[in-house]
Amino acid sequence: EISQGAGRLAGHLGLDNLIMFYDSNDIQLSTATDAVTSEDVAKKYEAWHWKVITIDGNDPDAIRTALTEAKAVTGQPTLIIGKTIMGKGARKADDSSYERNCATHGAPLGGDAYINTIKNLGGDPTNPFQIFPEVKELYAKRAEELKKIVAEKYAAKAEWTKANPELAAKLELWFSGKAPKVNWNVIEQKAGDATRSASAKVLGVLATEVENMIVSSADLSNSDKTDGFLKKTHAFTKDDFTGAFLQAGVSELTMACCCLGMALHGGVIAACATFFVFSDYMKPAIRMAALMELPVKFIWTHDAFRVGEDGPTHEPVEQEAQIRLMEKLKNHKGHNSMLVLRPADAEETTVAWKLAMENTSTPTALIFSRQNIANLPAGNDYSQAAKGAYIVAGSDENPDVILVASGSEVSTLEAGAELLRKDGIKIRIVSAPSEGLFRSQSKEYQNSIIPTGAKVFG
């Protein structure tokens, strides 16, 4: 269903450098497509302002003609619908046709069906991987053509680089994947602010200091406070792509996938935002970002039950556990597959954003509050948040109990600690914005924060 959102956005923005092929063979894994849908795909895309070309998808000349036509289209993307035959040329064991059969969708041909199919396609079953002379000649000719095309491209690039050294250096830096330089010292947070508002202040600085950053919101920029970024730039429109903000509309999965695409392309830093409870709609994309090690920044606000008048449909309960599970899973390189950060107050929010921008190897989750949060006690060393968990200033020596939390619950622990201290109980409060980061520290550090055998709540 991602095609719905992507199709709408591409048509709305008039992306005429986009050509999409649709293999329309009327067959799916379990049934023919007419068993589950009667929609007119061509009319649907035309309604989204796409140019639609329908061809015989098994005809190479028709494909080339359609591509040539599509390249000439301006002001809108193009969909090429190729009406094809599923399993074209395939034969069953009894040598009857295997075309337009659901069984060929995901199963390999074997036995006599395999032999009969190779024969039917003009091949030799005893030498099935033979390369026909005409195919070999075609590819050799194309290889030489491509060498010339590539050489011309490199020559043009070298000429442009020589004429535009500053832009060339900037382009190289952006595509290097290195973390951008940001003057974090200019960010002044307001004590007691909601962490979503603190995030807005950071985003305002990033909008002016990180030229290749693009932020998106699923119709919630005023609430998730990505408007802090938007106010320093403007949203993309069909006729103006000079801004750095994508208004995705109510389409969380589409928005997330767009950011994954930007990250895969390279050269830009992509971030997207919505309410934390709606991260459920984005899970497939989040999972893919973790698998592909894409440094997309996921901004999720309204992180607890204090979300206002919307009620339980907007109150995230299980979402944090789900996202933090991904932080514990290792990727193919053996690293945490995701960095999850839930800051305790406005100042810790700045540190969280710094960690997010410096994380260039995995996706980052930034989880912020809707409600205002009291700052942690004076003298708190927020730089320690980079270790995932640390002892909050004002904690007692030799504590009777250690209270651990992240986000807005840390200030709740502070209030509770005052009551416990009146009863003579010594309290250590630990802010743990990232369990994954904390568990990546040395055993000595972990034990210094939460000693083995200590009484721990949280």
Give residue ranges: language-model regions.
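Thiamine diphosphate
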Residues: S3-Q130, K136-I367, N372-A374, S442, N447-I449, ...
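Short glycine/serine/threonine-rich phosphate/pyrophosphate-binding segments
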Residues: E1-G5, L253-C257, D280-K283, V410-E414
